[in-house]
Structures are given as structure tokens and as C-alpha cells.
A protein has these predicted regions:
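Active-site-proximal substrate-binding core of FAD-dependent oxidoreductases
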Residues: 93-100, 112
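Active-site metal-coordination segments of metallo-dependent hydrolases
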Residues: 15-26, 64-77
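An active-site-proximal "capping" alpha-helix that borders the catalytic cofactor pocket
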Residues: 27-30, 72-88
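Divalent metal-dependent phosphate-bond-processing catalytic cores, especially two-metal-ion Mg2+/Mn2+ enzymes
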Residues: 2, 13-41, 54, 91, ...
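Short helix-capping and hinge/turn segments at secondary-structure transitions, especially at repeat
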Residues: 36, 59-63, 83-91, 108
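Membrane-helix interface segments
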Residues: 42-44, 95
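His-Asp-centered metal-binding catalytic motifs of divalent-metal-dependent phosphohydrolases/nucleases
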Residues: 45-64, 78, 100-107, 124
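Short alpha-helical hairpin
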Residues: 1-9, 52-58
Length: 175
């Protein structure tokens, strides 16, 4: 299955919602970069990329059912929607199962199992730490420095993810 078909399907799913499209596109970009630099196998990278494109697929049904996009609701609602989409697009059963597992856990930060899971969480954090910041007056955002430092200490485990976080948010010891 071609990941670009999934990318296009996700754009269509969130048509008229550029914020959501921008978000999953950025998460995918960081996930792919980290995955490649951390030398994931082609199979692991493929699953990671599919999960990065679909990780927030549960937002739409969560908002429709509960009026909320809370992380736990995304984890609850996302796998079923993703499973249907991935099956329709012809993804292999083992890929679908792992992607759905990752979607169903991507806001759970304890007991992270697997490099794909760790990297997906790091990529999502890189984007969310910026997007959840306060407006900076120039059309961008000013991230909460304490939140960045806490996430760096508690969440980031890969060398590449740590390096991107330090570089992006000007944490001490950037190298």
C-alpha cells in the first residue's frame, strides 16, 4: 500500500480543517525523520508513517459524540475509524493491528513499548509543544518553556528526538 494514498485519504477526511491537516502532516514529517535517523527497519518505518498520518483520526468522532477532542477519547474512538480506512486501502492485517494499537495508545506515556510507539509520541510532542503555545504576535506560537523542559526530561528517549527538541526550543546543551 502506498503511503501517499493514505496521506490523500487523510486530507480528504479532514477537508476544510487545515489545522488538523497541518498537524498530522508535521507529525508525519518528524516521525519519518526520527525513524530514519534511529535506523528503524523498513517495516517499522512503514508502520510508523501510517500511524503518524492516522494518529489523531479519533478527533472527529470524539468531537461528534462527546464534544471533546481529549486524548483519551481520541484513543478510544480512533482505532475503529482507522481500521476501516486502512482495510479499504488494502493495508496488511498485521500493519493495521499495530497502527490501531499505536492510535489507541498515543496519549498514554507510561509503558511505551516499541520504537515506533516512542517515536510517534516524540513527534506528536514536538508539534504539540509548539502548537499549544501562546500566540507570539507574528502568526506563530511561543511554547511554554517549563512544559518543554518537562517533556524533554520525561518523554524524549531517542537521540534524534532529543536533538530536535533541544534545537527547536533552545534548550541547554544543544549539539
Amino acid at each position: 500500500m502506498n503511503l501517499n494514498q493514505l496521506f490523500c485519504e487523510r486530507i480528504q477526511y479532514y477537508r476544510n480543517d487545515p489545522k488538523r491537516i497541518q498537524h498530522f502532516t508535521k507529525v508525519h514529517s518528524y516521525a519519518k525523520l526520527i525513524g530514519e535517523r534511529e535506523q528503524l527497519s523498513p517495516e517499522e518505518l512503514y508502520i510508523l508513517e501510517a500511524a503518524a498520518y492516522t494518529h489523531d483520526i479519533g478527533i472527529k468522532p470524539a468531537e461528534e459524540k462527546y464534544g471533546s477532542s481529549a486524548g483519551k477519547l481520541q484513543e478510544q474512538e480512533g482505532p475503529a475509524v482507522a481500521r476501516g480506512m486502512l482495510m479499504r486501502l488494502g493495508f496488511a492485517k498485521d500493519v493495521i493491528e499495530r497502527v490501531c494499537y499505536l492510535i489507541g495508545h498515543h496519549h498514554t506515556y507510561t509503558g511505551i513499548e516499541g520504537r515506533d510507539y516512542q517515536i510517534l509520541v516524540e513527534a506528536d510532542f514536538l508539534v504539540n509543544l509548539y502548537e499549544d503555545g501562546r500566540p507570539d504576535g507574528d502568526g506563530g506560537f511561543m511554547p511554554d518553556k517549563a512544559a518543554v523542559e518537562t517533556a524533554y526530561q520525561r518523554i524524549f528517549a531517542t537521540e534524534t528526538g532529543k536533538w530536535i527538541c533541544r534545537s527547536m526550543f533552545a534548550l541547554g546543551g544543544v549539539s
